[in-house]
A protein has these predicted regions:
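Short, functionally important secondary-structure microenvironments
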Residues: 1-165
Length: 165
């Protein structure tokens, strides 16, 4: 919720997160680059942006609450290789985003608008790049998911196995 003076009520956003997560998770608003969820300790950390957008915040909250609902701590902690963990995180993000959007269809619009706002700010680093030539398959999967399949990716036939998962 954005107040009339264009400030964001962080208490309201914290309560929204607890409702979406369906538990009394701990909420922190810190000077971090992006949101995160500590699956073990049940702590959601949200960034404090200079330019606030309700859609971006709601998208981040929904995504991190999806981790609260569906990311299994034991399996996640068992992945010790950092490169493998990065790949698994992209696949997990794709999986849980589909689940949260099915559980709470109203957040789909937040995802669309939030992605558009972040893309305009070049948050994803795609400005001036050929998304079909300059990105690895895992980055393409990540951006395809985050954009809700709205970016014009062309995948090689060998990539279809990854896309099916």
């Amino acid at each position: 919720m954005i107040k009339k003076d264009n400030t964001m009520n962080l208490d309201v956003k914290s309560n929204l997160a607890k409702l979406l997560a369906t538990e009394n998770i701990t909420i922190q608003h810190n000077a971090v680059k992006t949101a995160s969820f500590d699956v073990k300790n049940r702590v959601l950390t949200l960034p404090i942006f200079k330019q606030k957008s309700g859609d971006v915040y709601d998208m981040l909250i929904a995504h991190e609450c999806a981790h609260a609902l569906w990311t299994p701590y034991e399996k996640w902690e068992g992945i010790t290789d950092s490169e493998l963990r990065s790949y698994v995180n992209v696949i997990e993000d794709t999986r849980i985003d589909k689940l949260i959007q099915a559980k709470y269809p109203g957040v789909v619009r937040n995802y669309e608008n939030g992605f558009d706002i972040l893309e305009k700010q070049n948050f994803f680093g795609i400005s001036g790049k050929d998304i079909n030539k300059d990105f690895m398959i895992i980055d393409k999967i990540n951006l395809r998911s985050k954009s809700l399949n709205r970016l014009p990716f062309i995948f090689a036939p060998k990539d279809n196995d990854w896309l099916a998962k």
